[in-house]
Curated annotation (Swiss-Prot):
In contrast to vertebrates and insects, its C-terminus is not monoubiquitinated. The modification N5-methylglutamine is found at residue 107. This is Histone H2A. It comes from Gibberella zeae (strain ATCC MYA-4620 / CBS 123657 / FGSC 9075 / NRRL 31084 / PH-1) (Wheat head blight fungus). It is found in: Nucleus; Chromosome.
Length: 134
């Protein structure tokens, strides 16, 4: 049993070559995430499932932010997402704002907000207010 070489092991020109991203049904690159985990000195060893899970989490977060930013762009009657739409999407969502609270988005602007003390006071009926002032 010396092994023929051609019959065992991996085929050199494999027809079913499939990326780990497509196996997992992801758009984000699992191989690149794995390489970055290894090169980043986060740990001595990186398991096979870790980059798949991390790529799936990153893809989910990106999809969530882009969906909310697309809604913000549509509300402003725009067809292109700009940093302002990303800022509005993140700051108006409670969980994303908590996650990205200390992140500054360039050209994002600020949320429109007027403090209650600066707003004009509402007066219901003028007759009652004038009698109460005396």
């Amino acid at each position: 049993m010396t092994g023929g070489g051609k019959s065992g092991g991996k085929a050199s020109g494999s027809k079913n070559a499939q990326s780990r991203s497509s196996k997992a049904g992801l758009a984000f690159p699992v191989g690149r995430v794995h390489r970055l985990l290894r090169k980043g000195n986060y740990a001595q060893r990186v398991g096979a499932g870790a980059p798949v899970y991390l790529a799936a989490v990153l893809e989910y977060l990106a999809a969530e932010i882009l969906e909310l930013a697309g809604n913000a762009a549509r509300d402003n009657k725009k067809t292109r997402i700009i940093p302002r739409h990303l800022q509005l999407a993140i700051r108006n969502d409670e969980e994303l704002n908590k996650l990205l609270g200390h992140v500054t988005i360039a050209q994002g602007g600020v949320l429109p907000n007027i403090h209650q003390n600066l707003l004009p006071k509402k007066t219901g009926k003028t007759g009652k207010t004038s009698s109460m002032e005396l």
